[in-house]
Protein backbone atom coordinates (compact mmCIF):
# COMPACT_ATOMS: atom_id res chain seq x y z
CA UNK A 1 0.00 0.00 0.00
CA UNK A 2 1.40 3.41 -0.96
CA UNK A 3 2.10 5.92 1.78
CA UNK A 4 -0.26 8.89 2.08
CA UNK A 5 0.62 12.49 2.88
CA UNK A 6 -0.44 11.89 6.47
CA UNK A 7 1.61 8.74 6.95
CA UNK A 8 4.94 9.14 8.72
CA UNK A 9 7.80 6.67 8.99
CA UNK A 10 10.25 6.77 11.87
CA UNK A 11 13.91 5.82 11.98
CA UNK A 12 15.50 4.75 15.26
CA UNK A 13 19.31 4.45 15.18
CA UNK A 14 20.09 1.71 17.70
CA UNK A 15 23.52 0.46 16.67
CA UNK A 16 25.46 2.31 19.38
CA UNK A 17 26.90 0.87 22.56
CA UNK A 18 26.84 3.81 24.98
CA UNK A 19 30.06 3.34 26.95
CA UNK A 20 29.22 6.15 29.36
CA UNK A 21 26.58 3.88 30.92
CA UNK A 22 29.43 1.70 32.27
CA UNK A 23 27.52 -1.53 31.57
CA UNK A 24 28.25 -4.53 29.37
CA UNK A 25 24.75 -4.33 27.94
CA UNK A 26 24.08 -1.56 25.38
CA UNK A 27 21.94 1.10 27.04
CA UNK A 28 18.98 0.65 24.69
CA UNK A 29 18.60 -2.91 26.01
CA UNK A 30 18.59 -2.00 29.69
CA UNK A 31 15.18 -2.52 31.28
CA UNK A 32 12.78 -0.08 32.86
CA UNK A 33 9.90 -2.04 34.32
CA UNK A 34 9.03 -4.94 32.04
CA UNK A 35 10.33 -3.35 28.83
CA UNK A 36 13.71 -2.36 27.47
CA UNK A 37 14.49 1.30 26.89
CA UNK A 38 14.32 0.63 23.15
CA UNK A 39 10.81 -0.81 23.47
CA UNK A 40 9.62 2.22 25.45
CA UNK A 41 11.09 4.54 22.81
CA UNK A 42 9.56 2.68 19.86
CA UNK A 43 6.14 2.18 21.46
CA UNK A 44 5.92 5.93 22.10
CA UNK A 45 6.26 6.48 18.36
CA UNK A 46 3.78 3.78 17.35
CA UNK A 47 1.21 5.16 19.79
CA UNK A 48 0.55 8.00 17.34
CA UNK A 49 -1.81 7.02 14.49
CA UNK A 50 0.23 8.88 11.83
CA UNK A 51 3.31 6.76 12.51
CA UNK A 52 2.76 3.73 10.33
CA UNK A 53 6.24 2.19 10.28
CA UNK A 54 9.40 2.24 12.37
CA UNK A 55 12.78 1.27 10.97
CA UNK A 56 15.33 0.26 13.61
CA UNK A 57 19.00 0.29 12.64
CA UNK A 58 20.93 -2.19 14.76
CA UNK A 59 24.51 -3.37 14.87
CA UNK A 60 25.16 -6.27 12.46
CA UNK A 61 26.36 -8.37 15.42
CA UNK A 62 23.38 -7.54 17.64
CA UNK A 63 21.89 -10.75 19.08
CA UNK A 64 19.61 -9.06 21.61
CA UNK A 65 17.02 -7.50 19.32
CA UNK A 66 15.76 -10.85 18.01
CA UNK A 67 14.74 -11.76 21.57
CA UNK A 68 12.34 -8.81 21.87
CA UNK A 69 8.66 -8.84 20.87
CA UNK A 70 9.52 -5.91 18.59
CA UNK A 71 11.32 -8.34 16.30
CA UNK A 72 7.96 -9.78 15.21
CA UNK A 73 5.96 -6.53 15.16
CA UNK A 74 4.26 -5.99 11.78
CA UNK A 75 5.12 -2.26 11.73
CA UNK A 76 8.81 -2.77 12.48
CA UNK A 77 11.59 -3.11 9.90
CA UNK A 78 15.18 -3.86 10.90
CA UNK A 79 18.26 -2.76 8.96
CA UNK A 80 21.98 -2.95 9.63
CA UNK A 81 23.31 0.25 11.15
CA UNK A 82 26.71 1.83 10.62
CA UNK A 83 29.66 2.93 12.69
CA UNK A 84 28.24 6.43 13.20
CA UNK A 85 24.74 7.67 13.94
CA UNK A 86 24.46 9.38 10.55
CA UNK A 87 25.31 6.11 8.78
CA UNK A 88 22.54 4.32 10.67
CA UNK A 89 20.03 7.06 9.88
CA UNK A 90 20.91 6.91 6.18
CA UNK A 91 20.42 3.14 6.22
CA UNK A 92 16.99 3.68 7.75
CA UNK A 93 16.07 6.35 5.20
CA UNK A 94 16.97 4.03 2.35
CA UNK A 95 14.48 1.50 3.73
CA UNK A 96 11.61 4.01 3.57
CA UNK A 97 12.12 5.47 0.11
CA UNK A 98 8.35 5.86 -0.28
CA UNK A 99 7.98 8.11 2.76
CA UNK A 100 7.53 11.84 2.33
CA UNK A 101 8.23 12.76 5.97
CA UNK A 102 10.34 10.92 8.53
CA UNK A 103 10.90 11.12 12.25
CA UNK A 104 14.30 10.27 13.72
CA UNK A 105 14.22 9.32 17.39
CA UNK A 106 16.94 8.27 19.83
CA UNK A 107 16.78 4.62 20.84
CA UNK A 108 17.58 5.63 24.43
CA UNK A 109 14.99 8.41 24.79
CA UNK A 110 12.03 6.52 26.30
CA UNK A 111 10.02 9.35 27.90
CA UNK A 112 8.47 10.97 24.82
CA UNK A 113 5.03 12.47 25.49
CA UNK A 114 2.25 12.14 22.95
CA UNK A 115 1.31 15.82 23.08
CA UNK A 116 4.88 16.77 22.16
CA UNK A 117 4.89 14.28 19.30
CA UNK A 118 1.56 15.59 18.00
CA UNK A 119 2.77 19.20 17.99
CA UNK A 120 5.95 18.21 16.18
CA UNK A 121 4.04 16.29 13.51
CA UNK A 122 1.74 19.27 12.97
CA UNK A 123 4.56 21.37 11.51
CA UNK A 124 4.36 19.39 8.27
CA UNK A 125 1.27 21.46 7.47
CA UNK A 126 3.24 24.72 7.23
CA UNK A 127 6.94 23.89 6.94
CA UNK A 128 8.91 22.60 3.97
CA UNK A 129 12.03 22.10 6.08
CA UNK A 130 10.82 20.36 9.23
CA UNK A 131 11.90 20.82 12.82
CA UNK A 132 12.89 19.31 16.12
CA UNK A 133 11.64 19.00 19.65
CA UNK A 134 13.75 21.19 21.92
CA UNK A 135 13.63 22.64 25.42
CA UNK A 136 14.81 26.14 26.39
CA UNK A 137 18.00 26.30 28.44
CA UNK A 138 17.11 27.26 32.01
CA UNK A 139 20.43 26.91 33.81
CA UNK A 140 23.29 29.39 33.73
CA UNK A 141 25.71 28.22 31.06
CA UNK A 142 29.51 28.44 31.36
CA UNK A 143 32.09 27.97 28.64
CA UNK A 144 35.29 26.36 29.90
CA UNK A 145 38.83 27.27 28.98
CA UNK A 146 40.24 24.72 26.51
CA UNK A 147 42.07 21.94 28.34
CA UNK A 148 41.38 23.39 31.78
CA UNK A 149 38.74 22.92 34.47
CA UNK A 150 38.22 26.67 34.63
CA UNK A 151 35.51 29.07 33.47
CA UNK A 152 36.30 31.11 30.39
CA UNK A 153 33.05 33.09 30.46
CA UNK A 154 29.30 32.88 31.01
CA UNK A 155 27.24 32.13 27.91
CA UNK A 156 24.07 34.16 27.47
CA UNK A 157 21.26 31.62 27.70
CA UNK A 158 18.67 33.65 25.80
CA UNK A 159 17.79 31.82 22.59
CA UNK A 160 19.72 28.69 23.67
CA UNK A 161 17.86 25.39 23.39
CA UNK A 162 18.57 21.77 24.28
CA UNK A 163 18.04 19.68 21.14
CA UNK A 164 15.78 16.67 21.77
CA UNK A 165 14.24 13.99 19.58
CA UNK A 166 12.22 13.12 17.63
CA UNK A 167 13.44 15.31 14.79
CA UNK A 168 11.10 15.56 11.82
CA UNK A 169 12.00 16.32 8.22
CA UNK A 170 11.04 15.65 4.60
CA UNK A 171 12.75 12.36 3.83
CA UNK A 172 14.43 13.43 0.59
CA UNK A 173 15.75 16.66 2.11
CA UNK A 174 17.21 14.88 5.13
CA UNK A 175 18.77 12.18 2.95
CA UNK A 176 20.40 14.74 0.65
CA UNK A 177 21.68 16.92 3.50
CA UNK A 178 23.12 13.98 5.45
CA UNK A 179 24.81 12.63 2.33
CA UNK A 180 26.34 15.98 1.43
CA UNK A 181 27.51 16.70 4.97
CA UNK A 182 29.17 13.30 5.32
CA UNK A 183 30.81 13.53 1.89
CA UNK A 184 32.24 16.94 2.80
CA UNK A 185 33.52 15.84 6.20
CA UNK A 186 31.18 18.00 8.28
CA UNK A 187 30.64 17.23 11.96
CA UNK A 188 27.07 15.95 12.33
CA UNK A 189 25.82 15.56 15.90
CA UNK A 190 22.13 15.27 15.06
CA UNK A 191 19.95 15.35 11.97
CA UNK A 192 19.17 19.05 12.29
CA UNK A 193 22.88 19.86 12.11
CA UNK A 194 23.00 18.29 8.64
CA UNK A 195 20.23 20.62 7.47
CA UNK A 196 21.96 23.58 9.13
CA UNK A 197 25.16 22.69 7.28
CA UNK A 198 23.23 22.90 4.01
CA UNK A 199 21.78 26.31 4.84
CA UNK A 200 18.35 25.35 6.17
CA UNK A 201 16.76 26.52 9.41
CA UNK A 202 14.55 23.84 11.01
CA UNK A 203 11.71 24.87 13.32
CA UNK A 204 12.12 24.66 17.09
CA UNK A 205 9.08 23.01 18.70
CA UNK A 206 9.17 23.38 22.47
CA UNK A 207 9.02 20.01 24.18
CA UNK A 208 9.08 18.78 27.73
CA UNK A 209 12.43 18.74 29.49
CA UNK A 210 11.66 15.31 30.97
CA UNK A 211 12.05 13.78 27.49
CA UNK A 212 15.53 12.73 28.57
CA UNK A 213 18.11 10.57 26.85
CA UNK A 214 19.54 7.78 28.99
CA UNK A 215 23.27 8.38 28.70
CA UNK A 216 24.75 7.94 32.18
CA UNK A 217 23.93 5.54 35.04
CA UNK A 218 21.99 8.18 36.99
CA UNK A 219 19.69 8.78 34.00
CA UNK A 220 18.19 5.30 34.31
CA UNK A 221 16.53 5.97 37.67
CA UNK A 222 15.29 9.34 36.45
CA UNK A 223 13.76 7.83 33.31
CA UNK A 224 12.09 5.15 35.42
CA UNK A 225 10.57 7.84 37.64
CA UNK A 226 9.26 9.83 34.66
CA UNK A 227 7.79 6.75 32.98
CA UNK A 228 6.13 5.52 36.17
CA UNK A 229 4.61 8.96 36.73
CA UNK A 230 3.30 9.10 33.17
CA UNK A 231 1.71 5.65 33.44
CA UNK A 232 -0.03 6.62 36.67
CA UNK A 233 -1.31 9.86 35.11
CA UNK A 234 -2.71 7.99 32.10
CA UNK A 235 -4.56 5.54 34.38
CA UNK A 236 -5.99 8.31 36.56
UniProtKB/Swiss-Prot annotation:
Site (Positions MEP for the nucleophilic attack): 157, 213
Keywords from the named record: Isoprene biosynthesis, Nucleotidyltransferase, Transferase
Single Gene Ontology MF annotation: 2-C-methyl-D-erythritol 4-phosphate cytidylyltransferase activity
Source domain of life: Bacteria
Class in the EC hierarchy, top level: transferase
GO biological process, one term: isopentenyl diphosphate biosynthetic process, methylerythritol 4-phosphate pathway
E.C. no: 2.7.7.60
CDD domains with a match to the protein in the record: CDP-ME_synthetase (cd02516)
Site feature Transition state stabilizer, where: 20, 27
Reaction(s) this enzyme catalyzes, per UniProt: 2-C-methyl-D-erythritol 4-phosphate + CTP + H(+) = 4-CDP-2-C-methyl-D-erythritol + diphosphate
UniProt pathway: Isoprenoid biosynthesis; isopentenyl diphosphate biosynthesis via DXP pathway; isopentenyl diphosphate from 1-deoxy-D-xylulose 5-phosphate: step 2/6
A Pfam family of this chain: IspD
Subunit comment: Homodimer.
NCBIfam families: ispD (TIGR00453)
Homology family: Belongs to the IspD/TarI cytidylyltransferase family. IspD subfamily.
Protein's job: Catalyzes the formation of 4-diphosphocytidyl-2-C-methyl-D-erythritol from CTP and 2-C-methyl-D-erythritol 4-phosphate (MEP).
Name this polypeptide is given: 2-C-methyl-D-erythritol 4-phosphate cytidylyltransferase
Organism: Salmonella paratyphi C (strain RKS4594)
Lineage, highest ranks first: Bacteria, Pseudomonadati, Pseudomonadota, Gammaproteobacteria, Enterobacterales
